[in-house]
A protein has these predicted regions:
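Short glycine-aspartate micro-motif
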Residues: 5-9, 60-62, 123-127, 197
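Anionic-ligand binding region
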Residues: 121-124, 130-153
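Glycine-rich phosphate-binding loops at beta-strand->alpha-helix junctions
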Residues: 14, 187-219
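A short, acidic, amphipathic alpha-helical segment used as a generic capping/interface helix at domain edges
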Residues: 176-190
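Short glycine-rich, Thr/Ser-proximal phosphate-binding strand/loop in the N-terminal lobe
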Residues: 2-43, 141-170
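Short beta-strand scaffold segments in enzyme catalytic cores
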Residues: 15-19, 67, 114, 132-138, ...
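Glycine-rich phosphate-binding loop and adjoining helix at the ATP-binding site
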Residues: 29-53, 57-62, 68-122, 161-162, ...
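Glycine-rich phosphate-binding loop plus the immediately following alpha-helix
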Residues: 90-112, 141-179
């Protein structure tokens, strides 16, 4: 078998990994471990190295990270509880621990989005988990990343605070669902997207009827998007 691409999807609650081929098909089982907290870079790297030890051969690494990325460096990491992430070169650090294979990094919602979009029109992928992640695509091409997570949406609450895990500690699931519908209304006015995909660990909580243009994808279905980092300039 030709060596695959190791995909590491880092979230505020969990870290997932698998090896995929160039089309994104799984070559290994999906592995998962809880994200350590507080999550310093050295702690996360040790956790990832241990997690991926059973993986079959790979010669490239794709990383999805819960924050804003520019030129391979991390700009924000609000859900990982450490300022050591700011400016950190995670691809280089992981590459040195994992056989010096070339590594690329992208926002985690962007990574998952490549696996979930249809490739036609204006599409948005929203991850509902520890925080609120978003990715925007036009005709299959990734648009400049919009970090909506930290933008005010209602009563001076950011999207993270309004729909993330912090909100679920204060409101019941019914109210959370109503908030989700209000956010979808806001995004409809803002973007008029042809298709919106909801994914992430908290999509299991969605009970309301969604607009026809909105669909749900299982939280583990996006990892194959890591193959796209080696097909597209990101």
């Amino acid at each position: 078998l030709k060596p695959g691409i190791l995909v590491i999807d880092i979230g505020g609650s969990g870290i997932k990994a698998a090896v995929v081929d160039e089309q994104g098909n799984l070559l290994s089982e999906r592995l998962r471990v809880l994200t350590p907290h507080p999550c310093l870079p050295s702690v996360l790297i040790d956790t990832v190295v241990e997690l991926v030890a059973p993986c079959p051969a790979y010669n490239r690494i794709s990383i999805g990270f819960p924050g804003a990325i520019r030129n391979g460096l991390i700009l924000t990491a609000a859900n990982l509880d450490s300022r050591e992430w700011i400016g950190f070169d995670l691809p280089d650090a992981l590459s040195r621990r994992l056989g010096n294979h070339p590594a690329r990094i992208i926002n985690d919602a962007d990574l998952q989005g490549f696996a979930l979009i249809q490739g036609k029109g204006l599409e948005m992928v929203i991850t509902l988990g520890t925080g609120f992640g978003s990715a925007l695509f036009r005709d299959g091409q990734l648009m400049p990343h919009l970090e909506l997570a930290h933008h005010p949406v209602s009563d001076n609450l950011t999207y993270d605070q309004y729909l993330g895990n912090a909100a679920l500690k204060k409101i019941d699931v019914s109210e959370w669902n109503e908030r989700l519908l209000r956010v979808l209304d806001v995004l409809e006015v803002l973007l008029h997207a042809d298709h919106i995909v909801l994914t992430g660990g908290n999509v299991r909580l969605v009970t309301v009827d969604l607009p026809p243009s909105v669909s749900i994808a299982p939280s583990d279905s996006g990892i194959s998007g890591g193959a796209a980092l080696w097909r597209h300039r990101t």
